[in-house]
Amino acid sequence: MSENVIKETENKKNSRGRNWTFVLYPESAKAEWLEYLKELHIQFVVSPLHDRDTDTEGRMKKEHYHILVMYEGNKSYEQIKIITEELNATIPQIAGSVKGLVRYMLHMDDPNKFKYQKEDMIVYGGVDVDELLKKTTTDRYKLIKEMIEFIDEQGIVEFKSLMDYAMKFKFDDWFPLLCDNSAYVIQEYIKSNRYKSDR
């Protein structure tokens, strides 16, 4: 074993962090893995079952879950490894970014990968996954553009019509934007459309 490999292994064993991640394969996982995690009384997020992932050759990967465990204080690699061994999961790694990892669980930022659904995540211990998945500024602008195009295509002249549509058909993207921070610009756009059609 080379000196570099030994150093890397030692560094991993000596690492400490609050947020850790690992992969769990259902075919080899402990039967009661979810109950085991719940009994730890920690915050965690389990991805939807990744059953549509492909490798670079286009072959299907083995079904798996990405799991993020979160602690209030630092935990060592050895402490987390006890958990992954109990679950029969992969070796743990420190999560570089909680937000980035949760977005990756759904493949939100990779247009070439299958998109998994937020509703299929398992969230435990009060994790605010909606906050972690909050739209970026670029995402918001794209959705506002979508709404404006929809307003023009449908000839919408009342804000209520758009809100009703968003509530029924675009609850996960348009509706939160309209409720939280984009209503003013959209209302002004609809109002100007109405004045234009009245002339």
Curated annotation (Swiss-Prot):
One GO molecular-function entry: DNA binding
GO biological process, one term: DNA replication
Cellular component, GO annotation: extrachromosomal circular DNA
Keyword terms of this UniProt record: DNA replication, Plasmid
TM region positions: none
Entry-linked InterPro entries: Plasmid_rep_OBD, RepB_C
Keyword Heme: no
Disulfide bonds: none
Pfam families per record: Rep_OBD (PF01719), RepB_C (PF21861)
Family recorded in the similarity comment: Belongs to the Gram-positive plasmids replication protein type 2 family.
Purpose of the protein: Is essential for plasmid replication. Nicks the positive strand at the plus origin of replication.
Name of this protein: Replication protein
